[in-house]
Amino acid sequence: MKERTIQPVNNGLNGNITIPGDKSISHRAVMFGAIAEGTTTIKGFLPGADCLSTISCFKEMGVDIVQDGDEVTVVGKGLEGLQEPKAVLDVGNSGTTIRLMSGILANTPFFSCVQGDASIAKRPMKRVTNPLKQMGANIDGREEGTFTPLTVRGGDLKAIEYTSPVASAQVKSAILLAGLRAEGVTAVTEPHISRDHTERMLEAFGVKVTREGKTVKLAGGQKLTATDVQVPGDVSSAAFFLVAGAIIPNSKLVLENVGMNPTRTGIIDVLEKMGATFTVEPINEGASEPAANITIETSSLKGIEIGGDIIPRLIDEIPVIALAATQAEGITVIKDAHELKVKETNRIDTVVAELTKLGARIEATDDGMIIYGKSALKGNTVNSYGDHRIGMMLAIAGCIAEGKTIIEDAEAVGVSYPTFFEELQKLAK
C-alpha cells in the first residue's frame, strides 16, 4: 500500500496544465468503436487503469485494439461480430466498464462471466441487471444479480420503456446499448437528466437518438459506423486543480482543454456561486463534446446550499467541493446526494472521516453533508481507501494544511489521473 507525503504549498500553485482525457468519453469511444463497422481512431484517450480494463475486456471478445499512450485504434467488429470470451471478463475497479458492457453483452448471443475487484463486488448491479432482464437477457449473480460476479447469456431482446429510480448515466447507457439490437423502440426516463456522453457519441457513430425532456429513445436495428474521436480533458479531474487554484493562497492556474459538456459542469456553477474568480474560454465550439481553457486564481469563497437537479452534474466532484467548503466563509449544505454511498467508497462517510482527521468541521447527513467554514487544516495521516477521487482531494487538502499530510493507498489516483502527483509537484515549484 503506497503512501504519499504532501507538504504545505507556501508559494501557491502557478502555471498551465493540460487535463488528461475524459474517463467517461474514453470508455465509450473504445466500446462504440468495438461494435461499429470500420476503424475508429481515438485521440486524447485516458490511459488510466479503468479505461485500460475496458480495452482488455473487448480484446478478450476478439476486437483488435492498439493503444499507444493517449492514442487508440479500434478495428470494429460490428454489432454482431463480438466473439464469446474464453476467460472471465475482468473490469478491475471500473463501474462504467461493467455496467455499460452489460448492455452490450445482453444483446449478444453468447455466454460471458464478468467480475471486478473488491470494490466492484460491493457496488449495486441490480439497477442495471433488472431492466436488462426485463428486455429478455439471462443474467445471474450473487443475490439474484445484485452483485458480481455476473453471468450473462445474451440473445433476442425486446425494447422496453423504462423509468429509472435513479439519475444514472450508467443505467441509461446500459439499456440504450442493449436496445441497439432489441426489437422496437427502447426508452429510458430519469428523475433528473444525467450525463449524456452516450447519446452524443451514439449520434457521432451514426445512431439516431431522440431526447424528449428527461426521456431518451432509440430504435433497435441501427448500425454504428466508425468515426474519429477527439477526447477533451476530464472536468472531474480538472475539478481538483480548479479547487486548488481557488483555495491555495497566491495561486493562478490555466487549465487547458477541459470538457464542458453541460451535463457535467455543475462544479463550474458551484464555484461561481461560491464566489471563485475564474474565466472560461471556449476552444472548440460546434464539437459534439465542447471544451474550454479555464483560468482560476485564489479566491474568497462563501458557503452555499447544493442540491436538486445539479447533483447528477457534479456527483463525482462532491469530495473536492466539500474541501472547498472547508475554506469558505459560512455553512455549506450538500443534499440529495444519496448516490455517494454507492461509489468506490461510501463517499459521504469517507469524506467526512478523512477531512475531520485534518481538522475540518464537517458532519454527515443521510443524503450529503454539512460543512462549517472556515477551518484551518492540520496535517495528519489519512487514507484514500482505494478511491481515486478521495486520494486527490486529500492531496489538495494537504497543500493548505499546517505540517505534512501522509496519504495511505495513494496509488488509487492512477484509476483516473496517473500523472496527478507529478503535475501537482510541477505547479508548486
Swiss-Prot record:
<dbReference type="InterPro" id="IPR036968">
    <property type="entry name" value="Enolpyruvate_Tfrase_sf"/>
</dbReference>
<dbReference type="GO" id="GO:0008652">
    <property type="term" value="P:amino acid biosynthetic process"/>
</dbReference>
<feature type="binding site">
    <location>
        <position position="168"/>
    </location>
    <ligand>
        <name>3-phosphoshikimate</name>
    </ligand>
</feature>
<dbReference type="Pfam" id="PF00275">
    <property type="entry name" value="EPSP_synthase"/>
</dbReference>
<feature type="binding site">
    <location>
        <position position="23"/>
    </location>
    <ligand>
        <name>3-phosphoshikimate</name>
    </ligand>
</feature>
<feature type="binding site">
    <location>
        <position position="347"/>
    </location>
    <ligand>
        <name>phosphoenolpyruvate</name>
    </ligand>
</feature>
<feature type="binding site">
    <location>
        <position position="389"/>
    </location>
    <ligand>
        <name>phosphoenolpyruvate</name>
    </ligand>
</feature>
<comment type="similarity">
    <text>Belongs to the EPSP synthase family.</text>
</comment>
<feature type="binding site">
    <location>
        <position position="95"/>
    </location>
    <ligand>
        <name>phosphoenolpyruvate</name>
    </ligand>
</feature>
<dbReference type="InterPro" id="IPR006264">
    <property type="entry name" value="EPSP_synthase"/>
</dbReference>
<keyword id="KW-0963">Cytoplasm</keyword>
<feature type="binding site">
    <location>
        <position position="170"/>
    </location>
    <ligand>
        <name>phosphoenolpyruvate</name>
    </ligand>
</feature>
<feature type="binding site">
    <location>
        <position position="28"/>
    </location>
    <ligand>
        <name>3-phosphoshikimate</name>
    </ligand>
</feature>
<feature type="binding site">
    <location>
        <position position="316"/>
    </location>
    <ligand>
        <name>3-phosphoshikimate</name>
    </ligand>
</feature>
<dbReference type="InterPro" id="IPR023193">
    <property type="entry name" value="EPSP_synthase_CS"/>
</dbReference>
<feature type="binding site">
    <location>
        <position position="23"/>
    </location>
    <ligand>
        <name>phosphoenolpyruvate</name>
    </ligand>
</feature>
<keyword id="KW-0028">Amino-acid biosynthesis</keyword>
<feature type="binding site">
    <location>
        <position position="123"/>
    </location>
    <ligand>
        <name>phosphoenolpyruvate</name>
    </ligand>
</feature>
<comment type="function">
    <text>Catalyzes the transfer of the enolpyruvyl moiety of phosphoenolpyruvate (PEP) to the 5-hydroxyl of shikimate-3-phosphate (S3P) to produce enolpyruvyl shikimate-3-phosphate and inorganic phosphate.</text>
</comment>
<keyword id="KW-0808">Transferase</keyword>
<protein>
    <recommendedName>
        <fullName>3-phosphoshikimate 1-carboxyvinyltransferase</fullName>
        <ecNumber>2.5.1.19</ecNumber>
    </recommendedName>
</protein>
<comment type="subunit">
    <text>Monomer.</text>
</comment>
<feature type="binding site">
    <location>
        <position position="24"/>
    </location>
    <ligand>
        <name>3-phosphoshikimate</name>
    </ligand>
</feature>
<comment type="pathway">
    <text>Metabolic intermediate biosynthesis; chorismate biosynthesis; chorismate from D-erythrose 4-phosphate and phosphoenolpyruvate: step 6/7.</text>
</comment>
<feature type="binding site">
    <location>
        <position position="170"/>
    </location>
    <ligand>
        <name>3-phosphoshikimate</name>
    </ligand>
</feature>
<dbReference type="GO" id="GO:0003866">
    <property type="term" value="F:3-phosphoshikimate 1-carboxyvinyltransferase activity"/>
</dbReference>
<keyword id="KW-0057">Aromatic amino acid biosynthesis</keyword>
<dbReference type="GO" id="GO:0009423">
    <property type="term" value="P:chorismate biosynthetic process"/>
</dbReference>
<feature type="active site" description="Proton acceptor">
    <location>
        <position position="316"/>
    </location>
</feature>
<dbReference type="GO" id="GO:0009073">
    <property type="term" value="P:aromatic amino acid family biosynthetic process"/>
</dbReference>
<dbReference type="GO" id="GO:0005737">
    <property type="term" value="C:cytoplasm"/>
</dbReference>
<dbReference type="InterPro" id="IPR013792">
    <property type="entry name" value="RNA3'P_cycl/enolpyr_Trfase_a/b"/>
</dbReference>
<feature type="binding site">
    <location>
        <position position="343"/>
    </location>
    <ligand>
        <name>3-phosphoshikimate</name>
    </ligand>
</feature>
<dbReference type="InterPro" id="IPR001986">
    <property type="entry name" value="Enolpyruvate_Tfrase_dom"/>
</dbReference>
